[in-house]
Amino acid sequence: MTPSTSTPHTSTAPHTSTGQSTDGAAQPGDGSSAYEAGFTESASGRVYTVTGGDWEEILGAGEQDAERIVVNMGPQHPSTHGVLRLVLEIDGETVTETRLVIGYLHTGIEKSCEYRTWTQAVTFLTRADYLSPLYNEAAYCLSVEKLLGITDDIPERATVIRVLVMELQRIASHLVWLATGGMELGATTAMIFGFREREKVLDLLELITGLRMNHAFIRPGGLAQDLPDGTERAIREFLADMPKRIREYHRLLTGQPIWKARMVDVNVLDAAGCIALGVTGPVLRAAGLPWDLRKTMPYCGYETYEFDVPTALEADSFARYLVRLEEMGESLKIIEQCLDRLRPGPVMVADKKIAWPAQLSIGADGMGNSLAHIRNIMGTSMEALIHHFKLVTEGFRVPPGQVYTQIESPRGELGYHVVSDGGTRPFRVHVRDPSFVNLQAVPALTEGGQVADVIVGVASVDPVLGGVDR
């Protein structure tokens, strides 16, 4: 029987339509590709052939009218801001389709939190977005404090220091964006300048927290320790120098013809597109919408600080560059106000059932086992030692409930959904990372543009794959 051409099939008979032969139809044994995955043209239409195991090929056979090239960018590509894989379908130099592949940096951070105490979970979450670890710590600790009902009990000095270190971190993060973005566009001087100033910020954070990155400095109830001697002087020296550096960036890049040619009117995404995709942060503000959670939904007393929310209307890569530069200047204003507000006082809540020891000097090994620390724990009574042992090993209990807390990170809205079942460990911690959401905009930014502009588009979003994959 002659098979019908109305449905795909596998057969050893030639493909013909009922009552007539196929134009150019392949015959058995003629060595043609009719018996491989693909299609042939017949008088009644196109006939698809599947020989088994070739489904992936046949699914796209109908779209192969024109020649297409698929290019893999990453996951080891230096311009993908981490282990991000971009699968680009191109027609000449034009990108027709962009697909993102993530997950290469998954480390199970959220799941790991379920096997640690509420305080120990900070050491995992600070490693999610590794370019802004203090924001992960702050958002998580604010969530735990809401569940505990101690938000209003956090000492004023601890809250001010939290704002101080977060704004320092914002500057450091934007400087990494400037340096890596400059490197990807061939502006090596911008790379050198950006990392030069970032080193100064990391030196300040190391002075304050003991570590350059992954600080575990912000903890439920307050901070790990107070500011060491000389911190205020070092920060004020930085505040005096940094405005000159920002002006230097403007002189170097803002009017530079090649820099502008690569970024102006490139990777445009307007406010409506940002809202539809859930994009936040500098990308949204560069589209004209002044949405900044420090202003719209204040936390940590941000409503008492004076600063502006930089915006632009062009919604292109150059506008995102300008917004980030202006944000660094606004962060400097906030840091200066923090220094003026610092008053002596505790940096941890008074409730000893929650508070880990604070106000203690750190030993030479950085582990907090200085003589002052040991004397505070063991030099009082056996009951004090037992309490400390149980607090550290078992942790404190958090009442059952769930809470969602969002803050404004350097990349946008960073949200934490924290669930407690009444135990000493989190039942669930879910991170709404801005890089994960903002990456959804990359196809909208890049499709229809040039291959070279893909690098600009990804850089303008500024994703951190540690936060994306977690």
From Swiss-Prot:
UniProt region (Disordered), positions on chain: 1-37
One Pfam entry name: Complex1_49kDa
Compositionally biased tracts (Low complexity): 1-18
Major localisation: membrane
Top-level taxon of origin: Bacteria
Keyword Translocase among record annotations: yes
One cellular component term from this protein's GO annotations in UniProt: plasma membrane
Subunit-structure text: NDH-1 is composed of 14 different subunits. Subunits NuoB, C, D, E, F, and G constitute the peripheral sector of the complex.
NCBIfam families hit by this protein: NuoD, PRK06075.1
Similarity remark: Belongs to the complex I 49 kDa subunit family.
HAMAP family with a match to the protein in the record: NDH1_NuoD (MF_01358)
Full protein name: NADH-quinone oxidoreductase subunit D
Annotated organism of origin: Frankia alni (strain DSM 45986 / CECT 9034 / ACN14a)
